[in-house]
Swiss-Prot record:
Regions of this protein lying in the Extracellular compartment: 38-69, 115-197
InterPro entries xrefs: Tetraspanin/Peripherin (IPR018499)
Species whose genome carries this gene: Dictyostelium discoideum (Social amoeba)
Membrane topology: Multi-pass membrane protein
UniProt family annotation: Belongs to the tetraspanin (TM4SF) family.
Alphabetical keyword list: Glycoprotein, Membrane, Transmembrane, Transmembrane helix
Localization per Swiss-Prot or TrEMBL: Membrane
A GO BP annotation: hypotonic response
Keyword presence, Signal: no
Annotated protein name in UniProt: Probable tetraspanin tspC
Transmembrane segment boundaries: 17-37, 70-90, 94-114, 198-218
One matching Pfam family: Tetraspanin
Length: 238
């Protein structure tokens, strides 16, 4: 029978140092998540009125509000959790390490889920929904919303198929009344913006998840080592 003691470091020092190091890296990556979430929220905040007027309000809300806010909240939670991880690892707090590891496991599942969803999301379907809503709102009394979005995205008309004079009348114009971004269609601009942000969120989620898994595994080894330590009964485990 294999003796698992042979696989563990002889002292907790060799586990504490990499755990603290990985948590420091994860803290920095938590900042990255906050920045990414903030950028996405800032970008999609311009679609608030568009989403409200759209016939696909629920679907668009998930893309423009729920997902970016979720990334931001996870980033904030991550920063707090990694600080706790550094403290309980350094002080060898057994109960603290157990709680930290459990929370890391939950966060790992959430991160991999978000990262995988972002990378595998059907971008064509999302763009199709936006396009349908774009045309719908362009032909409604709230078409000023489209002019604001086109000015923000620096484009004119959703696509070449919808570039007749009716749609061009909504395009942003300069002081002389000339169309600013003629022949620069919003479909291509939007697709590029959304794709880059989804890829960034997806890669960040997967990379952080992998590093987090290693930190969590080392924390489990540290818990086992503390429990097996001759001094474990004398420890301040709380």
């Amino acid at each position: 029978m294999v003796n698992t003691r042979d696989f563990l470091p002889k002292t907790t020092h060799y586990l504490k140092v990499p755990i603290i190091g990985l948590n420091a890296i994860l803290w920095l990556l938590g900042l990255v998540l906050i920045v990414v979430g903030s950028v996405c929220i800032s970008f999609f905040s311009n679609f608030k009125e568009f989403t409200k007027e759209s016939g696909y309000k629920n679907a668009l809300s998930n893309l423009t509000t729920s997902a970016p806010t979720g990334v931001l909240v996870i980033g904030i939670f991550f920063i707090l959790l990694t600080l706790v991880g550094c403290f309980v690892a350094y002080k060898e707090k057994l109960v603290g390490l157990v709680l930290y590891t459990m929370l890391m496991l939950i966060l790992l599942v959430v991160l991999i889920g978000i990262g995988g969803k972002a990378l595998t999301l059907d971008k064509e379907d999302a763009v199709s929904i936006i396009g349908t809503s774009w045309v719908q709102i362009s032909n409604s009394l709230k078409n000023s919303t489209i002019t604001k979005l086109e000015d923000f995205l620096e484009c004119c008309c959703w696509s070449e198929s919808y570039s007749n004079q009716t749609y061009k009348d909504l395009c942003p114009k300069d002081d002389d009344g000339n169309i600013k971004y003629e022949d620069t269609y919003c479909e291509g601009i939007f697709t590029k913006q959304v794709s880059s942000k989804l890829v960034l969120v997806g890669i960040a989620g997967v990379v952080i998840g992998c590093i987090e898994f290693v930190a969590m595994a080392l924390s489990l080894f540290l818990i086992i080592r503390i429990c097996r330590s001759p001094r474990s009964r004398a420890y301040d485990q709380y």
